[in-house]
Amino acid sequence: MIGDPDTRRIDSNERLIMPYPSPLKILLAMAFVVACWAYSPTGIHIGLQAYEPGHLALLRFLLASLFMALIAVFKGICLPHWRDVPLLFALGFFAVSLHHVALNIGQQSVSAGAYSVLAQSSPLFSTLLARFVFKDQVSAWRWSCVLLGFVGVVIVVSGDKGLGAFDAHALLILLAAVSWSVYFALQKHHARRYDGFSLACYAVWSGTLMLLIYLPGLGQAVLNAPLRVQWAVLALGVFPSALAYLAWGFVLKHVDLSRATMTLYLIPPTAMGIASFGLGERPTLLVLVGSVVVLISVLALNLERRVGLVRTARI
């Protein structure tokens, strides 16, 4: 009984004995997650100074894979079922391969601040997936939020480079947001048999395997890259790609999902601050206005879900 991890999760007596982390510890974990993921746009921008987008994605996740493998040795993970292997590779494709290659290519001509806002638009696409793929009912309120969100996206893009200079790079960042929405939907509907850490490991490892198509030329790129870029890529592999997922799993274990996701709205302003300090970028007024519009639309989507849960609980 003691050696069975599933029994430990449902044993009420043990739950009383296990110490609950202090609010400060949870708050620090949330702040760590925000800081890690807000660093990504700046880290990618620096990495692209010496690496091609595919090389940068592969190197970043080779580092993340090794780091998570070391943690898995000590922490332990759930072994996958053979029937779940296609699903795990699909998760890796949408969460790692497609998502990060699209982000890297997109950020070649999009500022780090605009990138951080566009990448946060994934809940808007999740709503579209819920309606047109999973055939869920979508309220008029949620449709209004989606429309408002896309208005904000247009404002961000026009404020960043101008609509006259609009090209496929911003669309690729939106593609990355769509990819993340598909990953989240697959995880929600089909991957409940695994804990968060195991699922993150398999998504990272399978996604990294698919990124190996970019292996030719990577060694020479590593040798030619300056030290500043190497440190930036190392930080990308360890912090946003590995440690942040562990910290996020810790947060979700002790805080309900709707409340925890509220902290993610701090990522775009934090990312803009990091980019301002590290890259000397100054977001334009239109980018700031569009950012507020996008974040309000996404926040309104989540608030509607939360109100619905409260009403259901009262009934």
Regions found by a protein language model. Give the residues of each.
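Juxtamembrane helix-entry segments on the extracytoplasmic side of multipass membrane proteins
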Residues: 22-27, 49-54, 58, 80-86, ...
